[in-house]
Amino acid sequence: MHKVEHGVSCAGCPHRAAYIACKEALGRGKNKVICGNAGCSATGYMHPAATTCTGGEEALLPRYKKEVPNGGTVDQPAVEACIHFALDTEVAADDAPRHFAGLAAEGAITILAVMVSSRAFLGAEAIEELCQHMVEDLRIDDVVAVDPLDTLACTDILRDMLERPGVHAVAFCSPCVQLQGDRAPEPVDIDRIACVGCHRCKQITGCPALVFAPPAYTVDADVCAGCDLCTSFCRTHVIYSPRVRIAPTERCEMRYQAATSHS
Protein backbone atom coordinates (compact mmCIF):
# COMPACT_ATOMS: atom_id res chain seq x y z
CA MET A 1 0.00 0.00 0.00
CA HIS A 2 1.22 3.45 -0.96
CA LYS A 3 2.53 5.47 1.98
CA VAL A 4 0.38 8.47 2.83
CA GLU A 5 1.90 11.83 1.90
CA HIS A 6 0.87 14.97 3.76
CA GLY A 7 -1.37 17.10 1.55
CA VAL A 8 -1.54 14.55 -1.29
CA SER A 9 -4.48 12.25 -2.03
CA CYS A 10 -3.64 8.56 -2.20
CA ALA A 11 -4.30 6.46 -5.28
CA GLY A 12 -7.87 5.21 -5.00
CA CYS A 13 -8.96 8.04 -2.69
CA PRO A 14 -12.76 8.47 -2.95
CA HIS A 15 -12.42 12.18 -2.20
CA ARG A 16 -10.66 12.63 -5.54
CA ALA A 17 -13.54 10.94 -7.34
CA ALA A 18 -16.06 13.11 -5.48
CA TYR A 19 -14.28 16.30 -6.53
CA ILE A 20 -14.14 15.24 -10.18
CA ALA A 21 -17.89 14.52 -10.20
CA CYS A 22 -18.64 17.88 -8.54
CA LYS A 23 -16.39 19.75 -10.95
CA GLU A 24 -18.02 18.07 -13.94
CA ALA A 25 -21.55 18.81 -12.71
CA LEU A 26 -20.95 22.41 -11.62
CA GLY A 27 -19.03 23.65 -14.65
CA ARG A 28 -17.14 26.90 -14.72
CA GLY A 29 -18.11 30.44 -13.80
CA LYS A 30 -17.07 33.10 -11.30
CA ASN A 31 -20.32 32.66 -9.38
CA LYS A 32 -19.73 28.92 -9.02
CA VAL A 33 -17.51 27.79 -6.15
CA ILE A 34 -16.11 24.51 -4.86
CA CYS A 35 -14.62 24.98 -1.40
CA GLY A 36 -14.08 23.36 1.98
CA ASN A 37 -11.96 20.43 3.13
CA ALA A 38 -11.43 17.21 1.14
CA GLY A 39 -8.45 15.94 3.13
CA CYS A 40 -8.47 13.40 5.95
CA SER A 41 -6.82 12.74 9.30
CA ALA A 42 -3.73 11.36 7.53
CA THR A 43 -3.19 13.95 4.78
CA GLY A 44 -4.39 16.94 6.76
CA TYR A 45 -6.44 19.77 5.28
CA MET A 46 -6.78 19.70 1.51
CA HIS A 47 -8.72 22.01 -0.74
CA PRO A 48 -10.96 19.84 -2.96
CA ALA A 49 -9.05 20.93 -6.08
CA ALA A 50 -5.81 19.66 -4.51
CA THR A 51 -7.10 16.08 -4.69
CA THR A 52 -6.44 16.07 -8.45
CA CYS A 53 -3.25 18.13 -8.30
CA THR A 54 -0.13 16.02 -8.83
CA GLY A 55 1.74 17.88 -6.09
CA GLY A 56 -1.26 18.08 -3.79
CA GLU A 57 -2.13 21.01 -1.52
CA GLU A 58 1.35 22.55 -1.56
CA ALA A 59 1.53 22.66 -5.38
CA LEU A 60 -2.04 23.87 -5.98
CA LEU A 61 -2.03 27.33 -7.56
CA PRO A 62 -3.72 30.10 -5.54
CA ARG A 63 -6.32 30.76 -8.24
CA TYR A 64 -7.79 27.30 -7.63
CA LYS A 65 -8.01 27.69 -3.85
CA LYS A 66 -11.52 29.07 -3.69
CA GLU A 67 -12.53 30.00 -0.16
CA VAL A 68 -15.92 29.48 1.45
CA PRO A 69 -18.13 32.33 0.14
CA ASN A 70 -18.88 34.96 2.76
CA GLY A 71 -20.75 38.23 2.97
CA GLY A 72 -24.03 36.73 1.80
CA THR A 73 -27.36 36.32 3.54
CA VAL A 74 -30.17 33.81 3.25
CA ASP A 75 -32.09 36.31 1.09
CA GLN A 76 -29.02 37.35 -0.92
CA PRO A 77 -26.49 34.51 -1.00
CA ALA A 78 -22.87 35.24 -1.82
CA VAL A 79 -22.73 33.23 -5.06
CA GLU A 80 -24.97 31.47 -7.54
CA ALA A 81 -23.87 27.93 -6.65
CA CYS A 82 -21.54 26.53 -4.00
CA ILE A 83 -20.36 22.99 -3.34
CA HIS A 84 -18.92 22.90 0.17
CA PHE A 85 -16.76 19.86 0.98
CA ALA A 86 -16.60 18.52 4.52
CA LEU A 87 -15.37 15.38 6.26
CA ASP A 88 -17.76 12.92 7.89
CA THR A 89 -16.10 13.56 11.25
CA GLU A 90 -16.69 17.32 10.88
CA VAL A 91 -20.36 16.83 10.08
CA ALA A 92 -20.84 14.35 12.93
CA ALA A 93 -19.12 16.61 15.50
CA ASP A 94 -21.11 18.23 18.31
CA ASP A 95 -20.39 21.72 16.97
CA ALA A 96 -21.50 20.88 13.42
CA PRO A 97 -24.80 22.86 13.63
CA ARG A 98 -22.82 25.98 14.51
CA HIS A 99 -19.99 25.26 12.07
CA PHE A 100 -22.33 24.78 9.10
CA ALA A 101 -24.96 27.34 10.09
CA GLY A 102 -24.10 29.61 7.16
CA LEU A 103 -24.67 27.17 4.29
CA ALA A 104 -27.84 28.89 3.07
CA ALA A 105 -25.98 32.21 2.78
CA GLU A 106 -23.13 30.73 0.74
CA GLY A 107 -25.03 30.03 -2.47
CA ALA A 108 -28.50 30.32 -3.95
CA ILE A 109 -27.87 26.63 -4.45
CA THR A 110 -25.57 25.07 -1.86
CA ILE A 111 -24.52 21.44 -1.78
CA LEU A 112 -22.77 20.08 1.30
CA ALA A 113 -20.49 17.37 -0.10
CA VAL A 114 -19.70 15.03 2.78
CA MET A 115 -16.75 12.63 2.48
CA VAL A 116 -18.12 9.54 4.23
CA SER A 117 -15.00 7.38 4.22
CA SER A 118 -13.61 7.01 7.74
CA ARG A 119 -13.59 3.91 9.94
CA ALA A 120 -16.57 5.14 11.96
CA PHE A 121 -18.82 5.05 8.90
CA LEU A 122 -18.18 1.65 7.36
CA GLY A 123 -21.65 0.38 8.27
CA ALA A 124 -24.98 1.19 6.61
CA GLU A 125 -26.59 2.10 9.94
CA ALA A 126 -23.89 4.66 10.76
CA ILE A 127 -24.24 6.22 7.30
CA GLU A 128 -28.02 6.39 7.64
CA GLU A 129 -27.74 8.07 11.04
CA LEU A 130 -25.30 10.63 9.63
CA CYS A 131 -27.70 11.47 6.79
CA GLN A 132 -30.57 11.83 9.25
CA HIS A 133 -28.40 14.09 11.42
CA MET A 134 -27.79 16.36 8.42
CA VAL A 135 -31.51 16.77 7.77
CA GLU A 136 -32.59 17.22 11.38
CA ASP A 137 -29.69 19.12 12.95
CA LEU A 138 -28.03 20.90 10.02
CA ARG A 139 -31.36 21.81 8.39
CA ILE A 140 -30.46 20.33 5.02
CA ASP A 141 -33.39 20.14 2.57
CA ASP A 142 -32.48 16.71 1.22
CA VAL A 143 -29.63 14.20 1.40
CA VAL A 144 -28.59 11.58 -1.14
CA ALA A 145 -25.99 8.87 -0.48
CA VAL A 146 -23.88 7.95 -3.52
CA ASP A 147 -20.77 6.01 -4.46
CA PRO A 148 -18.23 8.65 -5.60
CA LEU A 149 -16.54 6.11 -7.86
CA ASP A 150 -19.75 5.65 -9.84
CA THR A 151 -18.89 8.76 -11.81
CA LEU A 152 -21.88 8.90 -14.16
CA ALA A 153 -24.50 8.37 -11.45
CA CYS A 154 -22.86 10.96 -9.18
CA THR A 155 -22.72 13.58 -11.90
CA ASP A 156 -26.38 13.09 -12.81
CA ILE A 157 -27.49 13.43 -9.17
CA LEU A 158 -25.40 16.57 -8.68
CA ARG A 159 -26.71 18.17 -11.86
CA ASP A 160 -30.27 17.57 -10.70
CA MET A 161 -29.54 19.20 -7.33
CA LEU A 162 -27.90 22.17 -9.04
CA GLU A 163 -31.21 22.88 -10.77
CA ARG A 164 -33.01 23.37 -7.45
CA PRO A 165 -32.42 26.37 -5.14
CA GLY A 166 -31.83 25.58 -1.49
CA VAL A 167 -29.41 23.64 0.67
CA HIS A 168 -28.79 20.04 -0.32
CA ALA A 169 -26.29 17.40 0.73
CA VAL A 170 -24.55 14.50 -0.95
CA ALA A 171 -22.97 11.80 1.18
CA PHE A 172 -20.11 10.39 -0.90
CA CYS A 173 -19.84 6.91 0.60
CA SER A 174 -16.77 4.78 -0.08
CA PRO A 175 -14.17 3.58 2.44
CA CYS A 176 -10.76 5.20 2.71
CA VAL A 177 -8.27 3.23 0.63
CA GLN A 178 -5.94 2.95 3.61
CA LEU A 179 -8.65 1.00 5.45
CA GLN A 180 -8.72 -1.53 2.61
CA GLY A 181 -5.02 -2.29 2.94
CA ASP A 182 -3.73 -5.26 0.96
CA ARG A 183 -7.30 -6.44 0.39
CA ALA A 184 -7.99 -3.56 -2.01
CA PRO A 185 -9.17 -4.61 -5.50
CA GLU A 186 -6.60 -5.64 -8.11
CA PRO A 187 -4.84 -2.83 -10.01
CA VAL A 188 -5.80 -1.75 -13.51
CA ASP A 189 -3.49 -2.20 -16.48
CA ILE A 190 -2.61 -0.05 -19.49
CA ASP A 191 -1.95 -1.30 -23.02
CA ARG A 192 1.27 0.61 -23.65
CA ILE A 193 1.22 -0.23 -27.35
CA ALA A 194 -2.23 1.30 -27.84
CA CYS A 195 -1.79 4.23 -25.38
CA VAL A 196 -1.25 7.48 -27.31
CA GLY A 197 0.26 9.32 -24.33
CA CYS A 198 -2.37 12.08 -24.38
CA HIS A 199 -2.03 12.59 -20.59
CA ARG A 200 -5.80 12.92 -20.17
CA CYS A 201 -6.03 10.28 -17.42
CA LYS A 202 -3.35 12.00 -15.36
CA GLN A 203 -4.52 15.56 -16.04
CA ILE A 204 -8.05 14.80 -14.86
CA THR A 205 -7.34 12.54 -11.89
CA GLY A 206 -3.81 13.42 -10.77
CA CYS A 207 -3.57 9.83 -9.53
CA PRO A 208 -0.07 8.89 -8.30
CA ALA A 209 -0.47 5.36 -9.69
CA LEU A 210 -0.45 6.69 -13.27
CA VAL A 211 3.14 7.07 -14.46
CA PHE A 212 4.26 8.53 -17.78
CA ALA A 213 7.09 6.42 -19.20
CA PRO A 214 7.54 7.90 -22.70
CA PRO A 215 5.96 7.38 -25.09
CA ALA A 216 3.04 5.97 -23.07
CA TYR A 217 1.56 5.65 -19.61
CA THR A 218 1.92 2.72 -17.26
CA VAL A 219 0.39 1.79 -13.92
CA ASP A 220 2.42 1.39 -10.75
CA ALA A 221 0.78 -1.82 -9.55
CA ASP A 222 2.19 -1.36 -6.05
CA VAL A 223 0.39 1.97 -5.74
CA CYS A 224 -2.86 1.39 -7.68
CA ALA A 225 -5.81 0.57 -5.43
CA GLY A 226 -8.11 -0.69 -8.17
CA CYS A 227 -10.66 2.12 -7.88
CA ASP A 228 -11.13 2.18 -11.70
CA LEU A 229 -11.60 5.96 -11.75
CA CYS A 230 -9.07 6.47 -14.54
CA THR A 231 -10.87 4.04 -16.86
CA SER A 232 -13.70 6.58 -17.22
CA PHE A 233 -11.40 9.18 -18.76
CA CYS A 234 -9.33 7.26 -21.31
CA ARG A 235 -10.56 8.32 -24.76
CA THR A 236 -8.84 5.40 -26.45
CA HIS A 237 -10.14 2.90 -23.87
CA VAL A 238 -6.77 1.27 -23.24
CA ILE A 239 -6.91 1.25 -19.43
CA TYR A 240 -8.22 -2.17 -18.55
CA SER A 241 -9.93 -3.15 -15.30
CA PRO A 242 -10.37 -6.73 -14.06
CA ARG A 243 -13.82 -5.53 -12.92
CA VAL A 244 -15.06 -4.38 -16.32
CA ARG A 245 -18.07 -6.73 -16.20
CA ILE A 246 -18.91 -5.97 -12.57
CA ALA A 247 -21.65 -3.42 -11.82
CA PRO A 248 -20.75 -0.25 -9.86
CA THR A 249 -22.82 -1.38 -6.87
CA GLU A 250 -20.87 -4.64 -6.67
CA ARG A 251 -17.55 -2.81 -6.99
CA CYS A 252 -18.55 -0.58 -4.09
CA GLU A 253 -19.44 -3.62 -2.00
CA MET A 254 -16.02 -5.12 -2.77
CA ARG A 255 -14.33 -2.03 -1.33
CA TYR A 256 -16.44 -2.15 1.84
CA GLN A 257 -15.72 -5.85 2.28
CA ALA A 258 -12.00 -5.14 1.93
CA ALA A 259 -12.18 -2.33 4.49
CA THR A 260 -14.18 -4.23 7.08
CA SER A 261 -12.13 -7.42 6.79
CA HIS A 262 -8.84 -5.50 6.93
CA SER A 263 -9.97 -3.39 9.89
Predicted features by range, described:
Residues 19, 32-121:
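Thiamine diphosphate
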Residues 1-16, 220-223, 238, 248-262:
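Conserved acidic/glycine
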Residues 1-20, 142-148, 172-173:
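Phosphate/pyrophosphate-binding active-site segments
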Residues 7-8, 78, 117-157:
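Conserved thiamine diphosphate
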Residues 21, 196-218, 225, 229-248, ...:
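Iron-sulfur cluster-binding cysteine motifs and their immediate structural context
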Residues 137-183, 228:
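Structural signature of the thiamine diphosphate
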Residues 17-18, 41-45, 90-93, 118-122, ...:
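Flexible loop/turn segments at secondary-structure boundaries
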Residues 1-6, 40-48, 79-80, 113-115, ...:
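Gly-rich Lys/Arg/Thr-decorated short loops/hinges at beta-loop-alpha junctions or inter-strand turns
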